[in-house]
Amino acid sequence: LMPETVARRYREGEENISTQHRDVSVIYAQLLGFEAFSRSLPSEESVSMLNSLVEAFDEAAERHGVEHVRSMQDTGLLATCGLVVPRIDHASRTIAFAKELAQIVGRFNDQHDAGLAIRVGIDSGPVTSGLVGERSTIYALWGEAVDLAHRVHAATKSAGIFVSDRVHDAVVGIYPFTAAGTVSDAAGTERVWRLDVANRQPA
């Protein structure tokens, strides 16, 4: 993902491009179990299956107005909502997106007799985006919401959809949650909440 406005500034020769975003939801999602599942498969088949999952994730992102920023090396993805297109309901959109990711994984498991799962961490707050690097320029995100979303995602090894206090407070009347511990951040301790959702992925 590189917004067209950023790409245009880059093509015009502008350097040190960055933008402050006051309120954005950030999603870290990691697919669990794919490496073990694909170990016995021919490489072409495993790549094809992974591509089908990534394509389904991208289609889900488009449906929910979520922006896929980049794929991660550990079969994960970093995404945002409200970054390129400001959205008042960015928190609830990310929850709906995360739920659909779990459903996609569940269908994959049914079709391929697999035992994959997904772990998602979400936070909302200020984000800075910009181009970094000289020889290999990439569009990157940093800031409080990016850091905390990653901490929430990494707070447990279990599958599930985990959110920060800010996301919980924004959607608590819409979705049910269970307390799932705490993580440390720059301001101290942050509660983590797990979305109560019936899905077909192993815990």
Region annotations inferred by a language model:
Residues L1-R22, S48:
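Regulatory cytosolic signal-relay segments
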Residues E4, R8, S25, A29-E35:
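Conserved nucleotide-binding and Mg2+-coordinating catalytic segments in signaling enzymes
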Residues A7, F34, M72, L77, ...:
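A generic structural signal for short hydrophobic patches within well-formed alpha-helices
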Residues R22, E35-D58, E62, E67-S71:
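Conserved long alpha-helical elements within nucleotide-processing catalytic cores of c-di-GMP signaling
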Residues V24, A29, A60-R93, V105-E144, ...:
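Catalytic core of nucleotidyl cyclases, primarily class III adenylyl/guanylyl cyclases
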Residues V105-Q111, D123-S124, E144-D169:
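Catalytic/regulatory signature loops of cyclic-dinucleotide turnover enzymes
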Residues V127-S129, A155-A203:
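Cytosolic regulatory/linker segments at or just downstream of nucleotide-handling modules
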